[in-house]
């Protein structure tokens, strides 16, 4: 979809929808929302619609960073303990590595 | 786009396999000939291939002094080479003073082990080469688990052990492969001699002879981890498209154990009557191991003791009526147990003790059938075990008892020991008797039963006192060159011990001792000694070939099926349990009641379709005549799995009262020999390859679609047909 052809009203609506969808534990949607509407939010002259877009984009950025921190922390934590072959880490592992713990 | 597609298709279409036989000299390595991973509850041991230890230049370590080169990484011989090495090493050079260098070397990829051909004699004291620990089975020791002793307090194998914990308990960084085939060994040696052997001035140059080998294990960590990962509920998302079950990463070491009951007691038809009898269990272990686990004949560790028990069993079998009558009168019985996996924390006896406690030994009971009556641990009076027969210093044997239990039942035990002494004396051997209440039982199957019952007594008969005299217990080198004198002495010892077993058993049951002590068949002992010990393979001698009668088939291409090995392994990949089973049937089986059975089919029907499941009927040849007959015996050949790693006994999972040894499933590849060129040569070849590729691209790039399209209409048009 080429959003440059959309009106500001539709852009706000789309940005809002993506933000709400991302709020359903879908951080990748927030990241897409951020990249998609970043120029409208921060690189073009401000107006009432773009202010709203900026609001959603900032919220998407904050949410994305939050998720990145949470997921990275979990990954480091999980991998640290997974390498010790603990019961709970094995339970959450999808494929056991062959020849190593 | 099409050009790229053509390039991709050409590259993808090239199969390099076709060139491999021109690049590599491949030597097939069967299962069991290489070091692989084993586990106990807490650790992993053995070898694993990785990028660092697959390839290397072949070097030789022929003598003690050559280990100096290991420290310098052979820099003086191969100054331009900076990679790793595969060292050709005779097994007898693995010693106390060399093992640390092998362990710590940073320039070894691996070692190629081979038998040097140097003969070792049973009494040879210059070679301390036991691959077992200073305290074998220390973690499973009754006294440790009963908190009477610290870990490894009695270093009984300190004279022979190469390392404190044994070579099987080392997590090696290197790989190991054992070459037993002389042709393969010659090929490697020739490759070394042609390319790697330094010239007289000490110099050498490219190309070198290199070797690659890879053994990849599936499992890692320890028994607990790999046992858990093998379960279907180990993962939240268990998705295995092939079978639906979790793939097997490792398996519990297990194999057949043999239990023979000369005078079996049947279960009562209704199972209401519990018969209480007393038993003496005569036992010898049937397993051994080496640094590469499977490479272990176990001549003294296993075979001589087994022969002495077999000879006693045969004597009993030839006059079974007397024993039966005495047992019926005294309500005391003797049975024979050959436990497997005893050198690995008592796998066989641990499982047997567990089954006894649960009323499942020796058979699972079905109420509608008659079986051998279950034996409970409290019914075991004595465990008479023999160990390391044939290597006594002089003519002296020792009896080992548990001091405290001995004091509790001194009179009866003294009587048993007295009969043993008489048996030994009849062959001019002396016996050193127990010294007092502080006596401890050396590593023996008794430890498993001692944990199950507080009264079972040990009577361990062996040619050592406080420490093992034989210095190659559980070792690749437990394979001797027997001189005529040494052979004769060993046979005498076996005969004496066999007589002692018979004497003690006869007195326990109530048979007149004098009637049986003279009945040990020395000729049989000599024959079995030559077959099992002197011969190169189990079925090389006439006696065993006749006993086989065409029944033995090498089912697997594994070391244990093609060579003499007494290692327990993870599957039934060794021939020895079959050999021992047939010998036990020969010793105790009888065809008196089955003389009318003339075919294998009718013999097997006897066992299958009867409610009386106490006896087995085996269509087996007589090893003297080769004539088949249907032998009736009460012999149970049973796979025993340690309860700690048996999926059938989840309540005992990883219980350290039992053995937790497991083996990894592994993929073994062949040894590849190849020529190693200097790095500059390889860079030149890469450059040529890149230039060739570029030229090819340009050549293809100049073509168009029409280059490859033959206009079939053109000749026709020339012939006058319209286009």
Swiss-Prot record, chain A:
Cytoplasmic compartment spans: 39-57
Entry's transmembrane regions: 18-38, 58-78
GO CC terms: endoplasmic reticulum membrane; gamma-secretase complex; Golgi membrane; membrane
Record's keyword terms, sorted: Endoplasmic reticulum, Golgi apparatus, Membrane, Notch signaling pathway, Transmembrane, Transmembrane helix
Residue intervals on the Lumenal side: 1-17, 79-101
UniProt note on tissues of expression: Expressed from 100-cell stage in most somatic tissues, including neurons, muscle, intestine and developing vulva. Little or not expressed in early embryos.
Membrane topology value: Multi-pass membrane protein
Keyword Cell membrane appears in the UniProt entry: no
Subcellular location: Endoplasmic reticulum membrane; Golgi apparatus membrane
Claim: Amino-acid biosynthesis is one of the keywords in the record: no
Record InterPro entries: Gamma_Secretase_Asp_P_PEN2 (IPR019379)
A GO biological process held by the record: Notch signaling pathway
Quaternary structure and interacting proteins, as annotated: Component of the gamma-secretase complex, a complex probably composed of the presenilin homodimer (sel-12, hop-1 or spe-4), nicastrin (aph-2), aph-1 and pen-2.
Biological role: Essential subunit of the gamma-secretase complex, an endoprotease complex that catalyzes the intramembrane cleavage of integral membrane proteins such as Notch (glp-1 or lin-12). It may represent a stabilizing cofactor for the presenilin homodimer that promotes the formation of a stable complex.
Family: Belongs to the PEN-2 family.
Name of this protein: Gamma-secretase subunit pen-2
Originating species: Caenorhabditis elegans
Curated annotation (Swiss-Prot), chain B:
Glycosylation positions in this chain: 40, 181, 271, 328, 409, 627
Alphabetical keyword list: Glycoprotein, Membrane, Notch signaling pathway, Signal, Transmembrane, Transmembrane helix
Residues on Extracellular side: 17-678
Membrane topology listed for this record: Single-pass type I membrane protein
GO biological processes: cell fate commitment involved in pattern specification; egg-laying behavior; embryonic morphogenesis; nematode pharynx development; Notch receptor processing; Notch signaling pathway; protein processing
Main location: membrane
Membrane-traversing stretches: 679-699
Cytoplasmic compartment spans: 700-723
Any one of the GO CC terms: plasma membrane
Coiled coil: none
Superkingdom, taxonomy of origin: Eukaryota
Cell compartment(s), UniProt: Membrane
PANTHER family assigned to the protein according to its UniProt record, in alphabetical order: NICASTRIN
Function: Essential subunit of the gamma-secretase complex, an endoprotease complex that catalyzes the intramembrane cleavage of integral membrane proteins such as Notch (glp-1 or lin-12). It may represents a stabilizing cofactor required for the assembly of the gamma-secretase complex.
Family, as annotated: Belongs to the nicastrin family.
Protein name (Swiss-Prot/TrEMBL): Nicastrin
Organism annotation: Caenorhabditis elegans
